[in-house]
Amino acid sequence: MAHLTAILLGNELVQIIIGPELKEFFVHKTLIRSTCDFFDRAFNGRFKEGIENKMHLPEDDAEVFEIFVNWMYSGHLKGGLREPMLIIYIWIFAQKCQAITLKNCAMNALQDALDNEIIGPFSLSNSEVTHIYEHTAWGDELRVFAIAMLAWEITFGDPEDVANLESTFDDVNGSLEDVLEFIRDFGGMPVADPRVRGGRYDKCAFHEHSTHDELVCVAALNSHRYRNIH
């Protein structure tokens, strides 16, 4: 980020140890505390982590955390993220840490990865929908996106993907009911493609925003995929 100067960052670092492989990361304490409430609370001076400037996150993934660190310093997700499951992992990590802007950037990246202009659009796989349902709650933006994606697949999806769709509804408890309710909420109108931002789905349709957010969505500003649905 252009505004990250040595004065603003300070010179105090914290050590974060990730995953069973114990990969170490050293980041500026001021920056990571300003990124999300989870790390702000953890590195508050009253707690052990704040006193020792050290934290162990044994259940998190080192690749995902490295992407988080890169995003934290640069202000955008690294280019070339094309694996939907990896992006789903990033979203879930951001949800855990309540890094709202990272969540929104990950959602943009997921839409773009599934709507790849070079090698063609993709649907969510059975394993991806299963993982989303296992790690989200009702109303979470990522689950709503998965439901919207399945709803679109029912009407407009590739006939060759029917087996994947049926297996998803069989394996993911409650997913079919969620999708049918979602379709009913459209009131008879055709379901829109949720991979496309800037038409019947607003650019921020699957973002999280609060009343305290900036007037302009940073994730939307950083997005390059603003296409209209005609």
Regions found by a protein language model. Give the residues of each.
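Short interface patches used for recognition in eukaryotic signaling and trafficking proteins
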Residues: 24, 49-56, 91
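C-terminal helix/juxtamembrane-tail motif
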Residues: 174-230
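Long amphipathic alpha-helical assembly cores
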Residues: 55, 156-189
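N-terminal BTB/POZ boundary and linker segment
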Residues: 1-31, 59, 63, 70-85, ...
